């Protein structure tokens, strides 16, 4: 059983810069073999700012800074109040989009919003490896190769090792499909993963 409260806001302070956020909290009753627990659960509530700037008629610079917040916990124990989510700078044009920073991998993005329980205790991340958000990240998304089909490629470089993730994504009308590949070792390279994402 769960009661979910979701509140979103977006405040446009300039033609190409937006402040936004979402509070997503559920009241959950969890019955397990060890105990029965009723508690408020934060489901990736967040705040952020994003914007874009036209460098030319065919070239755009964009950015996003996004942090997870937990309205159910005042963090009196000294834990971080904010947890970094997708935070990056990107340049896009006829060639596609090139971006760097902290971001979901191509494999993670290949969900294509089919995870109906995303951000909750029943998130697909608990049964499927590859729900990774990495820093030291460089990503590329191609323009459509054919109608509705593009490629996403990204890589990371860290002191613990390197990794790559790639996906073919198809989206047209009501049909969506994706084929993604990511080494299992990516999970061990993982630099950051939010509690529910």
Model-derived segments and spans:
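N-terminal signal peptide c-region/cleavage motif recognized by signal peptidases
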Residues: 8-10
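Conserved small/polar residues in nucleotide/adenosyl-binding loops
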Residues: 187-194
